[in-house]
């Protein structure tokens, strides 16, 4: 099993790395399948992982992997890279990959910010950040993933015209993200008039979303890299 990397920088944007023992079948997949589909540790070219890919997508913090696996299944010609530090989530995702026989998924067990640092300029066609840890207490806001420095890093690795989707069920995190993403001149709303509470046609509901742990209905923010 791949050992989770040390937190990126002085503050990490995620909580516990493990909540419960991994089931034997999932552990077997972590030991055998995960090494085969893991992204390299260090700078890499995405198309080296799947030369025939017509697009490259990144999901940051894929949770249990339901959304990532469904998107990959619907888009078999797209390379879908996912990053997740939570070992139980990675175990679940690897099971989805095996059960659905997905050939276009690559996984990093660790901090997604490392993957963003390793990627070359202008290589991503789409980025998903679905229901990240809200760190909703004011004293913890500095731990939120969406910070100006990270938005700038996303701008570097996304192609002109690439799409960024951020979803949350915490109202203040939606406002926080809107302010910080639009403050970067590289980004704009994909549709200024869009209903942010409308569920996108290509959205895949996850178990986390169904728990309704936030303080508002899900908000979907779709941005375009200029």
Swiss-Prot record:
EC primary class: transferase
Residues the entry annotates as binding S-adenosyl-L-methionine: 59, 84, 111, 133
Gene3D superfamilies (UniProt xref): Vaccinia Virus protein VP39 (3.40.50.150)
Pfam family, one: Methyltransf_4
Keyword Methyltransferase in annotation: yes
Residue segments, region Interaction with RNA: 139-144
Listed pathway(s): tRNA modification; N(7)-methylguanine-tRNA biosynthesis
Reactions mediated catalytically: guanosine(46) in tRNA + S-adenosyl-L-methionine = N(7)-methylguanosine(46) in tRNA + S-adenosyl-L-homocysteine
GO CC terms: tRNA methyltransferase complex
This protein's UniProt keywords: Methyltransferase, S-adenosyl-L-methionine, Transferase, tRNA processing
GO molecular function: tRNA (guanine(46)-N7)-methyltransferase activity
Positions of region (Disordered): 1-22
Active site: 133
Enzyme Commission no: 2.1.1.33
Positions in coiled-coil regions: none
Residues holding substrate: 137, 169, 206-209
Domain of life: Bacteria
InterPro entries for the chain: SAM-dependent_MTases_sf, tRNA_(Gua-N-7)_MeTrfase_Trmb, tRNA_methyltr_TrmB_bact
Similarity comment: Belongs to the class I-like SAM-binding methyltransferase superfamily. TrmB family.
HAMAP family: tRNA_methyltr_TrmB
Function according to Swiss-Prot or TrEMBL: Catalyzes the formation of N(7)-methylguanine at position 46 (m7G46) in tRNA.
UniProt-recorded name of the protein: tRNA (guanine-N(7)-)-methyltransferase
Organism: Caulobacter vibrioides (strain NA1000 / CB15N)
Lineage of the species this protein comes from: Bacteria, Pseudomonadati, Pseudomonadota, Alphaproteobacteria, Caulobacterales
């Amino acid at each position: 099993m791949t050992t989770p990397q040390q937190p990126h920088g002085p503050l990490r944007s995620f909580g516990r790395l493990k909540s419960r023992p991994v089931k034997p079948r999932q552990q077997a997949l972590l030991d055998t399948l995960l090494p085969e589909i893991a992204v390299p540790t260090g700078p890499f070219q995405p198309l080296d992982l799947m030369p025939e890919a017509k697009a490259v997508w990144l999901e940051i913090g894929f949770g249990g992997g339901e959304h990532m696996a469904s998107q990959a299944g619907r888009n078999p010609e797209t390379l879908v890279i996912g990053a997740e530090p939570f070992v139980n989530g990675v175990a679940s995702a690897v099971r989805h990959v095996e059960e659905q026989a997905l050939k276009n998924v690559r996984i990093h067990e660790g901090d997604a910010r490392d993957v963003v640092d390793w990627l070359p300029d202008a290589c991503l066609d789409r980025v998903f950040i679905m229901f990240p840890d809200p760190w909703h207490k004011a004293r913890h806001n500095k731990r939120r993933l969406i910070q100006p420095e990270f938005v700038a890093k996303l701008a570097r690795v996304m192609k002109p015209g690439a799409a960024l989707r951020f979803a949350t069920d915490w109202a203040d995190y939606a406002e926080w993200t809107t302010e910080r993403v639009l403050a970067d001149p590289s980004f704009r709303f994909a549709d200024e008039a869009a209903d942010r509470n409308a569920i996108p046609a290509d959205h895949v509901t996850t178990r986390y979303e169904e728990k309704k742990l936030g303080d508002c209905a899900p908000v979907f923010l779709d941005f375009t890299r200029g």
